[in-house]
UniProtKB/Swiss-Prot annotation:
Pfam entry (one): Ribosomal_L28
Protein name: Large ribosomal subunit protein bL28
GO molecular function: structural constituent of ribosome
Superkingdom of source: Bacteria
Species assigned in the record: Haemophilus influenzae (strain ATCC 51907 / DSM 11121 / KW20 / Rd)
Amino acid sequence: MSRVCQVTGKRPAVGNNRSHAMNATRRRFLPNLHTHRFWVESENRFVTLRLTAKGMRIIDKKGIDAVLAEIRARGEKI
C-alpha cells in the first residue's frame, strides 16, 4: 500500500539527516498516515480511508460527503 494521503495527496518527501559534523545522509520524511473508518450517513455505510492527521482535520471542517465527492471527482474508487 502506498504512503499517500487520500484527502491531501501528501506523499513521502526526501531530504538529509545531518550529524553534528554536518555530514549528510539521505532520508525520507513520511506523512503522518492513519487508516480511519468514517460513517457516511448518505450512503448508510462505513468508508475506510488512509489519510494524514491534516486530512482528518479537513474532513472535520468540510464534512465527509464533500471530501468524498472531491476524491471521486479525481477518479479514485472508494
